[in-house]
A protein has these predicted regions:
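Basic/polar N-terminal segments that are highly enriched at the extreme N-terminus
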Residues: 1-4, 118-120
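Short beta-strand micro-motifs enriched in acidic
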Residues: 48-50
Length: 120
């Protein structure tokens, strides 16, 4: 596979059930639309729901770390954080962040489809 220079922010929340998962995704998708997606280098935000109804992972993909850093330096962080707080307060259930530190990552390796290796 070719090298992937993209940069990711992986946001992890614990929630109290499937209804809260759905509310969380709706609220945080709106935050992406209003506060993030128009920045240069933004590629996508994908929301993953655990099948047991207890977790939501959001993976925000940027074209590069430089694009992400530009977003951090030039965006309205205070306004975005207020919108996040308001979104969390508006949920009918409970959602708690599980990240520690800055939740940013680069791709180290990816294994894609191909023939089975038999040289074990």
């Amino acid at each position: 596979m070719s090298a992937d220079a993209s940069f990711h922010s992986i946001i992890d929340y614990t929630v109290d059930g499937p209804d809260t998962q759905q509310e969380f995704v709706a609220a945080f998708a709106e935050i992406q639309e209003r506060w993030v997606r128009f920045y240069p280098g933004y590629q996508s935000a994908r929301f993953y729901l655990s099948t047991d109804g207890t977790r939501v992972y959001t993976i925000v993909r940027w074209a590069s770390e430089a694009d992400y850093r530009n977003f951090v330096e030039t965006s309205d962080t205070e306004g975005r954080m207020a919108a996040i707080s308001q979104a969390l307060a508006g949920l009918s259930g409970r959602a708690e962040a599980r990240m520690t530190g800055i939740p940013t990552y680069t791709v180290a390796r990816e294994v894609g489809p191909g023939p089975q290796r038999l040289d074990v």
